[in-house]
Amino acid sequence: MKSTPFFYPEAIVLAYLYDNEGIATYDLYKKVNAEFPMSTATFYDAKKFLIQEGFVKERQERGEKRLYLTEKGKLFAISLKTAIETYKQIKKR
């Protein structure tokens, strides 16, 4: 499966996390995959990159790994979210 060619998977994951902070990792994957199909490997690689680059933090809570944006991630996600929402509207037409 391919992600949309317009955005890198990291951008999509970051934008979706903006509206779903504290979500379990696999639950975020399901949300992202519903609109932007990607393999689990692609999703987890994107998540790993975002953590390494300091955009996302992962915490173990209630027996699950949960994801949170850092301040850097929040600032970047705001602009990505707008662009991705616009792209989704264009695709619907």
Curated annotation (Swiss-Prot):
Entry keyword Transcription: yes
Molecular function GO terms recorded: DNA binding
Domain of life: Viruses
Gene3D superfamilies, per the entry: Winged helix-like DNA-binding domain superfamily/Winged helix DNA-binding domain
Residue ranges of the TM segments: none
Function as written in the Swiss-Prot or TrEMBL entry: Probable transcription factor that recognizes a (pseudo-)palindromic DNA target sequence.
Protein's name in the database: Protein F-93
